[in-house]
Every structure is written in C-alpha cells, then in structure tokens.
C-alpha cells in the first residue's frame, strides 16, 4: 500500500490502494486489490473496500469483483459482498454475496444468482437464475441450487 495509517487507540491499520498476494507452496496463487483496506482484531481480520478484485493465477481467466471483502486470516474463507461478479472465458456469475473457501477451492454464490454462458463463436444465449450456485475452481464446473423454487433457465438459439 502506498499510504497507511495506524490508529493506536483502537489498534487498526488503514491502508490505501491495497495489493495482497496469496502464496501456495512458495508460489503466488491469488492477487487481491482494493481501493482501501483495514487490518482489524490484532491483524487477524482484513476488511477490503472499493473496487475489490481477486485474480486467480492458477486459472488466469478467473477474476472476481465485489464492492467489499472480509477475510479472517486464521480461516480459509474469504467473504465477498455487493455486486459480486465472477468472470472467465466462458461464464459470468453474479450475486450479492459469495464465499470463497480456499481449503476446498469452491465459491458459493448466494441468492439471487444470475448465470450467463459466454461464447462469442456461437449464437447460443444461455441464462440461469437460482437461489445459490457453487463454482469449483479446480474442476471449473458450476452447480445450481434452489430450495423452494425451480431453477429458471433460458436458452436462445
């Protein structure tokens, strides 16, 4: 961060233009950027705000955008809140909230979920609406779930 401020009374670091690198086996696997962030609870929690972007370096096509994100450093879960969008070369998934579980490498998108298949070489237009969706980063597959309502699909040729 190019600018940081430590507030001693409440033990919080405030940072601007944050860039966080996540390592797995001494190799960068994710990069997270935001306009500002705070280190809370004796540096155990990170709160990111403003144009939060997560880049998956294991699959460079995957990017996730959100308004805010929270991460407890001791846990494997990263919570994204507000206008959450997963993009890659073939899909776009949108929801108001998502949780990335790093241990399982699965992203759970919460109600309401909108999905769109992206393929520029085809006239196929495929849309799905569901309560929840689960995206497996390793297998690159997507599972939809609705508890009380039917999953709505729309195919246009």
Feature-to-residue mapping (PLM):
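Mature-chain termini and adjacent capping regions
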Residues: 1-157
